[in-house]
Each structure stands twice: as structure tokens, then as C-alpha cells.
Amino acid sequence: MTANATYNFAGKTILITGGAGDIGKATAQRFAVNGAGIVLLDLNESKMADVAQALKEYRVPVSAFRCDVTAAADVAKAFKQAIEQRGQIDYIFNNAGYQGTFAKTDEYPEADFQKVININVIGVFQVLKAAAQHLRSMGGGAIVNMASYAGVMGPPNMLAYAASKFAVIGMTETAAKDLAAAGIRVNSLSPSLIGPGVMWTRQTELQAAVGSQYFDRDPKAVEQQMIHSVPLRRLGSLEEVANGVAFLMSDEASYITGFNLEITGGQ
């Protein structure tokens, strides 16, 4: 990844939840290449350690802490550790999430619906609250919540995920109004079809398995059906998502708050 001179994050620190995932890693790289220190939070300590190791080439401070975003005590502990180690956090990318089961509405399992809501709504709330408290004490900063285009248009067979991401967009709009006077900007990001990566592979395989009227039963055919729905006729890249996060955090977006940035290729 090459540096983009538009953004100078030297001397700043970004905290990224879901730091062991594909988007978390790409975003960490995007900020590190422009000088930001990185704090990773995730439940998967092994994968998170791999990401931290990969960031060493950028010669910026990197910290990693285990955190269950659904647990307020865990989030508070992770923020305390990060602040004690780094002094302050300037940006928070509220990125941890879970796609959940793919199933028709009348067949959707209640237990998995609850799990999706716990991670994608309660988890985002816990991190958003902790981030707001810290940034208020620092006199301001920026938060980006990971939503999804599923929270804009409601895709088939993704009932819980769509519900959770609609909620994230709503929380973002309210938090932006509540926190503006404290100098805290809050925006959300809604990618649509992003790949290659773990979530893209999972999505095509599980949509095919549902057997709905919308998609073929062959994952490869589903992949082509999805790409054909994009006016630009390609997937978005992880780096393009990371670029969206960087823009929303940067001074270039200093008059933008309460905004949901759609990264959709024109969908």
C-alpha cells in the first residue's frame, strides 16, 4: 500500500475494533502508511497478532488487546489499556461485526438473530459510548461506525444483518447530533460487495445454499449475479473501504458529520 499525501495522520492514534478481520487489517495499513499509531481490538487474538506483525513494516506504534465488544466491562478495560499505553486515542473505527445466518424470513433462527443484534448493535453501542466519553475528555475527535449497504436496501435472506445495519446508521445520525458540540464527528460507512475476502466467499456460498428465487444454487454463478448488479461491474476492494474510513476521519471531512458514506460501485 502506498502513502497518500492528502492525509497526514502522524502523531495520531486510531483504535480499530474487528482489527483481526480483512477490513480491519486494510484500514490499519491505510492509517499506518500515513503515520498513525494503531490499536487493534478483537476476540481472535491469534489473527490479531498476525495483523500486528504485518504492521511492523510501517514503523508505527502498534498495540493489540482482546475485547468482546458486546460486554461493557471488556470495552472499558480495552479502552483503559489503550489509553494508558498510548496516552490518547484520536479516531475510533467501530468495525467489529457478524453477518449471521443466511435464511428466509420465516425460517430465520431466533438464536442467530439475537447473536447478530448483540454484536452489530449492542457491540457498536458499547464502543460508541466508550469512544464518545474518551473523545469528549480530549476535546474532540472522529468516529466511523461500520454499517453496510444492507442497512440501506435490505438484501434477501439477511434479515438480522439488515436490521442491525439499519440500526447502526440510525445510531450514527443521533450520535452525530448529540456529540457535535463536543467537537466529535460521527459518520458511518456502507460498503456493498467487497472482495476478495472471507466475508465475500461466505456470502456467495450461503446465498447459494438458501435456494431463493434471487440467486443460483452455484456459488460461482451467485458471484457473477452479484457483480452484474453493480453498475461498475466489479467488486469493491478492501483498500477502497479503508480509503473511505481515512477520508471520513481526516481533516478533509471536517464539516461532515452524521453522514453515511455508501461504497457501492453505483448500486
Give names to the regions the model predicted.
Residues 7-39:
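Canonical Rossmann dinucleotide-binding motif of NAD(H)/NADP(H)-dependent dehydrogenases/reductases
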Residues 125-128, 136, 232-263:
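C-terminal substrate-recognition "lid" of short-chain dehydrogenase/reductases
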Residues 128, 164, 172:
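Active-site helix of classical SDR
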Residues 133, 177-178, 254:
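Alpha-helical segment proximal to the catalytic Tyr-Lys
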Residues 148:
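Residue(s) in the substrate-gating loop at a strand-loop-helix junction
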